[in-house]
Structure formats: C-alpha cells, structure tokens
C-alpha cells in the first residue's frame, strides 16, 4: 500500500506540474496535501474512481483582469487583478484579497487551494477562493489607494455576492481598503449586503474580526502546548511580521504570560530582549496602522531594542515561534537555527510560511508544528461569523465572538488529533489538518455529483 501511494503521488504531481508549468507555490501547496492524504485515498478506491483530488486541484473558475488607475500626478498605471474560485462544495467561495507586488496566478491558486481546506476545518459552510492584485499600497496616498480599489471592484463585482463569493482582507488589504472596496460595490450594485467581511463595526463588521487571526493562532497554540502539559507562561516567543496577524498574535501571547521579543517587516527585524509591553504594543499599532511606518522605527523609539536590517528573526533563541509574515519565510537553515536555539513549538500565523525542507526538520526533531491552514483559521472563521451576523441583521458582543472563536479553534485541534496522531504518539498536524479538510470537501463533492 505504501509503495502504491508513493507512486500515486509522483504520477499525480508529474501531471499537475505539466498542466500548470512554472507555478511553484501552487505545486508546493498541492504536494503537501497529496502526500498527506494519499494513503487515505488509495484505501478508499471510490475516491480514485471519482478523481476527487484531480477535481480539487482544478479551480472551478479563474478570473484575471486589468485594473487601470491614475496616481496623484495624473499618470496612468495598469495592474493585474485576480480571483481564483477554487471550490464551492461546502458553501459560497470565501477567501481574502491581497494587494502586493508579488501577487501572481501561482500564488493566488496556492492560497485558494489552502483556503478550501482551511475553511472546511472551521466546520462553517464556506468554500475556498482567493484574489488580489500586484498593486502595492505601500507608499501610495489614500486617494491613490481609493482610486485603485474602486477600479479593482468595478470588475470584481461581477463575480461576487453574499451567496456566491465573499472576499475579505489579506496582506495589503486592511480596514481602509475593505471600506473603499465595499463602497464601490454598494455604489455599483445598489445594495447593502454582506458581500465583504472585515467591514467597519459601524457598517456591518464583527467585533474581534481584526484580532481574530492572531488570537486564533494563540488559542490553537494553547491546545498544542497542552498536549505536552505546557503553557505560554514564562516562554520566550519569536513573532515575524508586524501586520494584523503578527500584531494580535504578539498581543495575545504577551497577555497569556509569554515574553515576545521580535517583530519584523520586509526590511528586517527588531529584537527587544526585555519583551513587548502593552505600551510598546500601542506604539506598534500606531506605527504600522496609522503612520504606516517601518519596524526599524521601533528600535529608534526604544533604545533597548536592536534592529537587524535584511534579516529574519529565527536565529534568536526561543521556546515558541509564530511565523506571521508571508509564504516561505522559514527555510531549512532557519529551521535548524530554531531547533538549535531551543524552540519546541512552531505555530504558523501566515499562509505556508515554512518551506517543505524546514517542515521536515521540525518533524524529524519532533517539535510541535502546525500548518497555517489549521492554526490561522481563526480569521476566516470569524469572517464566517460576520457573514452569519449580516444574514440576521444583528451584531454579537465581543464575548460571544471570542467564545465561538475559542470553540472553533479547539474543534480544529481535535480534528488534527483524530487524523494526525502517529502510532508513537507524535501529532502530525499537517497530516491531520489535510485529511480532516479533505474528507469534508470530498464527501460534499461526491454527494453533489460530477460538477
């Protein structure tokens, strides 16, 4: 059986790569899932007969479009927009919109594929999608971001809706951008519906939505730590990134008793051996969310911190690492440095931040390691809760949302334990998350026929 499964994986991947040449991020995401579920698939021949995996890796729809806009000098720019609607077997498409220079079709497909499994893990009725553009808001004025967002939504609005596809924010798309996108959708469609999530509290948003992904990472980490009778109390924590996910993961870890000593951005990282405090976190919120400055300014504000330009934080000794920046930020050397530095728990806040060879290092060392599709699902879970609140024209209290977020992250952890516990007791969270998500989506696809 094992040899057959291995041959099945290689044949499957050869065909996928031939059909999708040059899409290395998409290949990487698919291989991780296929390797995890191959034994399960070959054990149940009807899954092979129905070609479930072959159907899962083929998007139901890909929309690619031009986005023309003018800058403040009147100069015309053309960017490229995407929406990959991967799978709607268990609900309307759901997934973020990313505005970043690195955006391309491969990254959109990888993110939409990951989103399908992540959304299935939440147990909420949401399919998988992802969208975005190679436009970067960095260095742009509010007016330029607004004009771009309005142009982007002028095309995207044809393909989305509260029961069809519900986008949200992602890298480069925060509350400001969601506001501009929602305003243009409402203007064109003449309707006020829950078509986007991550909205402002005064116009259909959910309490705790900004905090949800970062908080959810820590709630999931608590469940992982409990399997080894550990907690955050007194632990040294590395956080990469300084955007939404990193900010709230750092804040929650700190409030759970950990000492958070790093934050980063694309230019480098800061190391504060004394650890973040509530006052320092408020400075980070103002720096990144209001002034949209660079993390090096933290070290200028707090002389006890050291700024490392052009580097990542993984060389710093720690107990727990929370990668919350971007895909493939932890390579093999970084993983070995983490292990050598005493790290025993890695919980992903970003999407696919760990390269396959680094995952192998973690699993060989028997670290607690969770993939983002499980541990960062709190964001989309709370987006799903926002959809529910919009449907009933109601707004829950922060306590209600937090309780639901806790429950969902705990349930995801239980699913990972069910399908990922190895014979020796080691918990393979990658395998557990992939099989749990796969089973739910596969069963729905079979029930709905060949569509």
Language model features with spans:
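Adenosine-phosphate binding glycine-rich loop
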Residues: 2-29, 224, 339-451
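Flexible, glycine/charged-enriched surface loops at secondary-structure junctions
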Residues: 24-27, 45-50, 123, 160-169, ...
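Structured beta-strand/loop patches that form or line metal/cofactor-binding pockets in enzymes
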Residues: 46-77
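Glycine/serine-rich phosphate-binding loop and adjoining beta1-alpha1 elements at the start
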Residues: 100, 119-233
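General beta-strand structural signal in soluble alpha/beta enzymes
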Residues: 110, 164-168, 191-196, 239, ...
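Glycine-rich phosphate/diphosphate-binding loop of Rossmann-like nucleotide-binding domains
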Residues: 197-200, 205-315
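Rossmann-like adenosine-cofactor binding region
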Residues: 268-369, 374
